[in-house]
């Protein structure tokens, strides 16, 4: 079992690796973290979590988490989206600024 906060934090942690998980997969990831932390899955073992839903169906939830707009959750792993125009140069400039290039 996983709380709303545990699933949101687990999904946010996965977001930082380039994934875009749904809350259902967030539950599975949160439980995986719990099993690893409790030693039921050791550091030498491998585990696979199969995501069967698409995070795009839950964009409002994910944006709410990362923008800190979910009153019942503190967004401890928020990664606030940056909105840019649909323009290559604007995107490139922002990437350069964020990466120090």
Give the positions of each predicted feature.
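Phosphate-binding loop/pocket of nucleotide- and phosphate-handling active sites
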Residues: 30-101
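Active-site-adjacent helical/loop segments in soluble small-molecule enzymes
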Residues: 1-43
